[in-house]
């Protein structure tokens, strides 16, 4: 019993030290991020952050994620609204759907509305919807020119960040 009490005291001490070192927000981010490892559908308003790993997260037309979705492989199918998407995840933003801020390094398909998107030029973006601001990062590798397939969509503002001096588009 005494070993269990000592172990519990050690865990509490570590938690206190983490809070003192990084602040309450660091603990809150880790504690409030919901890990998704199998296909999941969100159909209501949700303020949690999601970490998606090698599966599909679907946000239905009644779904609204006000937090951030972090990708590590896998795919997001958005039919509703998502505040922010970051990292390595494929995105399918469907008709009537909205994404406020998209930072992705994998293929993007947009038929809805994206307020702001930043993507790596080694990926393909297919747009038949509306993108208010598109930022393209060209890493400067050979054959790293951006591919933007436009079916019937609009891009209001296009910004290209080129790290080699070459014209990436």
Residue ranges: model-predicted function:
Residues 31-169:
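Extended beta-solenoid/beta-helix repeat architectures
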Residues 11-23:
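Bacterial N-terminal signal peptides
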Residues 1-3, 25, 84:
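Intrinsically disordered, low-complexity regions enriched in serine, threonine, proline
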Residues 1-12:
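Bacterial N-terminal signal peptides that target proteins for export
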Residues 21-33:
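Sec-dependent signal peptide cleavage junction
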């Amino acid at each position: 019993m005494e070993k269990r009490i000592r172990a519990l005291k050690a865990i509490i001490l570590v938690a206190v030290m983490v809070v003192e070192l990084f602040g309450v927000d660091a603990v809150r981010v880790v504690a409030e991020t919901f890990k998704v490892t199998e296909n999941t559908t969100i159909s209501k308003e949700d303020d949690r952050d999601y970490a998606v790993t090698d599966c599909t997260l679907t946000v239905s037309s009644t779904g609204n994620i006000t937090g951030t979705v972090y990708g590590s492989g896998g795919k997001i199918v958005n039919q509703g609204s998502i505040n922010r998407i970051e990292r390595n995840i494929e995105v399918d933003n469907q008709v009537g759907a909205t994404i406020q801020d998209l930072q992705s390094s994998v293929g993007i398909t947009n038929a809805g509305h994206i307020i702001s998107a930043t993507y790596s030029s080694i990926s393909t973006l297919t747009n038949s919807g509306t993108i208010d601001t598109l930022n393209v990062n060209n890493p400067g590798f050979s054959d790293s020119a951006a591919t933007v397939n436009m079916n019937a969509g609009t891009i209001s503002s296009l910004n290209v960040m080129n790290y080699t001096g070459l014209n990436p588009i």
